[in-house]
Amino acid sequence: MIGAFRIVGYVIASADGRIADASGHPASLKLDADHRFFAAGLNHVDAVVHGRHSHEGEPDSVRRRRLILTRRVASLAPDPENSMARLWNPAGASFEEACAALGLSSGTVAILGGPLVYTLFLKRGYDNFHLSRAVNVRIPDGLPVFIREAYGGEPEAALAASGLTPGPTLWLDDEVSVTDWERAG
């Protein structure tokens, strides 16, 4: 928890731990079973957090409160393209201040990526992290889930090092598995 906020991560990674190809495109990771799991999970969150290149792409996305991480603002600013969103620079405003700008003082916040965003919240503390794997997809030279300079190795190693423990792996279909990592206590 960060203050009164429950922090939940969602990612689908390739079998080799990548979330997109070198150009930032995750097309090979757009799989129906994971999409349904992800969309169902987002129905239970109060806000989402992502970088400027990440987005959940759901029909109701514009109605969801969101923080978009960027260095283009000093602290917080309205998103000129979405009245439900705020641009947030963590160097200039705390997470609690950013959530307050969305009208939230508590609740569940979903972290949607990319690597800098996932790593920021790995340092701050996830309560739960849903790690989906596209077991038949490999993306050589792709983008990792977490910044490797800070948290080398596979996403599982980074999650374990941050104090999360894996639950059982659930198979969504023959292409996608998901493991829920949780903080004890």
PLM segments and residue spans:
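Enzymes that bind and transform nitrogen-containing heteroaromatic metabolites
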Residues: M1-G185
